[in-house]
Design a protein with these regions (language model features):
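Positively charged
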Residues: 1-145
Length: 145
């Protein structure tokens, strides 16, 4: 994952962590307490997103291209930043978790149903690949099952 909100793991804090992933432009890890989106672009970008709360589910989500944000970091310092690209997208996604929304709320029922069908197919493919990998590993060691 590229981000995780405290409430996703049962913690009662208005906080999330983003970063530490090659897709984050500056590679920076941000610990965001009491985050706020102060402004956002009218220009949007439609892009495929996933979420740790919904394994193997990927949906096209339209989001503002940039956001101006404010949060308190782990040292108690108030930070204001202009974020763009994947960093802006992830900040928005995690902020929604804290506000009681998940990315499935942002698409139509039809798009969600299509996404769930693709999710089921991807899960089956992953299981088959793992089974094949294990069979090959066992066979290479001449282990009888």
């Amino acid at each position: 994952g590229i981000g995780l909100s405290a409430n996703q793991v049962g913690l009662p804090f208005r906080m999330f962590v983003i970063g530490g992933h090659p897709q984050i432009e500056d590679g920076k890890i941000r610990n965001c307490f009491n985050p706020l989106i102060k402004d956002f672009s009218q220009e949007t970008v439609n892009m495929k997103e996933g979420c740790l709360s919904f394994p193997f589910l990927f949906l096209m989500i339209n989001r503002p291209k940039w956001v101006n944000v404010e949060y308190t970091d782990e040292n108690g310092e108030k930070i204001e930043e202009y974020l763009h690209g994947m960093t802006a997208r992830i900040f928005q996604h995690e902020n929604e978790h804290m506000n009681g929304y998940v990315f499935t709320d942002l698409v139509s029922k039809l798009k969600l149903d299509r996404g769930k069908k693709a999710q089921a197919k991807l899960i089956k493919q992953t299981i088959r690949r793992q089974q094949e990998r294990l069979r090959n590993e066992v066979a290479s060691k001449n282990v009888k099952i």
